UniProtKB/Swiss-Prot annotation:
Domain (J) ranges: 5-70
GO annotation, cellular component aspect: cytoplasm
Gene: dnaJ
Protein name: Chaperone protein DnaJ
CXXCXGXG motif repeat extents: 150-157, 167-174, 189-196, 203-210
Length: 380
């Protein structure tokens, strides 16, 4: 049976760089790895072919021989006579350690029972608080259900003083290997489930796992100035580990409710304040509430325009891990009078008839530009 072209197997061109070859192999190997396809002989064979192709193409000398002689390069009876076995260890854990940083289990002599698989999972909890809670800080009670250490066996999984014995199938390693040609396939030991040990007398409460599901109640301290999306890490408050292994962590994510008055950007607060046309024109003062519960007298400059911003220093939110605060910005919205009486209309008309071009410089200047533009068009 003829072999598939190594480049076609990995889906790369003959000019592919080592990085492109490594990336392509990573993608394909993850798809066909035996651990992801238990009992699938077709996937197992595909994985062998992919690994063989990678081992050749990633090596400069082997690749050169393959490009020149094809598959005959690795057949002692062929023209190239390149000894494939001389450069291949037959243990794919080396390849995967190189590609995935040791992410695949089963390095030589490694013990499954000590790897990260037994560690409890991290958990996430979302809380919703008010802007005032974020300003003042708060202690929030939370409750959730997860795996906790078994109180009967203290997490050991054993009943009473019973001890664990070494698994006779994997000899305490936690995984077993089978040789197929010059390929080594490594799988988790099915007898001890990768623990390397077997409990002779399992705890009745937790069935030997060392953990049970229960409700956890905590009081979480919310720091001053926390923002939406910030997370608080509580070490060891996640899921309990398997048979006394380290517990995961709990991450509490905050979500700040929408405020009826303020909007927030980092440590700064913003609010839109409508004011009368007369106040904007003549100037004056307004009373403004702050997030800290106090009131501040704010000066509105004479001739204030719609959209102008007034800044109140250090009237915003606390800055985390600092004694300082952000600022508060007041954006002015000049309100046009509506439902005027006859007298009010007459007064406004009288005001508008006053020959003072300086009181509305923007609109006066704009319409002068319009007249000039129109005059130029007509003259052309």
């Amino acid at each position: 049976m003829s072999k598939s072209d190594y480049y076609d197997l990995l889906g790369v061109s003959k000019s592919a760089t080592p990085e492109e070859i490594k990336k392509a192999y990573r993608k394909m190997a993850l798809k066909y790895h035996p651990d992801k396809n238990p009992g699938n002989k077709e996937a197992e064979e595909k994985f062998k072919e992919l690994s063989e192709a990678y081992d050749v193409l990633i090596d400069q000398d082997k690749r050169a021989a393959y490009d020149k002689y094809g598959h005959n390069a690795f057949d002692s009876s062929g023209r190239g006579g390149f000894d494939f076995n001389s450069g291949f260890s037959g243990d794919f854990s080396d390849i995967f350690n190189d590609l995935f940083g040791g992410g695949f289990r089963g390095g030589r002599g490694s013990s499954r029972r000590h790897d990260s698989g037994a560690v409890g999972s991290d958990l996430r909890f979302d809380i919703e608080i008010t802007l005032e809670d974020s300003f003042n800080g708060k202690k929030v009670p939370i409750s959730y259900v997860t795996y906790v250490k078994c109180s009967s066996c203290s997490g050991s999984g054993s009943e009473g003083s019973a001890k664990s014995v070494q698994c006779s199938t994997c000899h305490g390693v936690g995984n077993v290997r089978t040789q197929q040609g010059f390929f080594t396939i490594e799988r988790t030991c099915h007898v001890c489930n990768g623990e390397g040990e077997i409990i002779q007398n399992k705890c009745k409460k937790c069935s030997g796992s060392g953990r049970v599901r229960d409700e956890v109640n905590l009081l979480v301290t919310i720091p001053k100035g926390i923002e939406s999306g910030n997370k608080i890490r509580l070490n060891g408050k996640g899921e309990a580990g398997y048979r006394g292994a380290r517990s995961g962590d709990l991450y509490v994510y905050s979500n700040i409710q929408k405020h009826k008055f303020f909007t927030r950007n980092g440590s700064d607060l913003y609010c839109n304040v409508p004011i009368k046309m007369t106040l904007a024109a003549l100037g004056g003062h307004i009373e403004m509430p702050s997030i800290d519960g106090t009131w501040t007298k704010v000066k509105v400059p004479e001739g204030s325009q719609n959209g102008d911003k007034l800044r109140l220093k250090e009237k915003g939110m606390p800055i985390i891990n600092s004694s300082k605060r952000g600022d508060m910005y007041i954006q002015i919205t000049v309100e046009t009078p509506v439902k005027l009486t006859k007298k009010q209309k007459e007064l406004l008309q009288k005001f508008d008839d006053e020959p003072n071009v300086d009181c509305n410089p923007q609109s006066t200047g704009f319409f002068q530009k319009v007249k000039s533009f129109w005059k130029d068009i007509r003259s052309n």
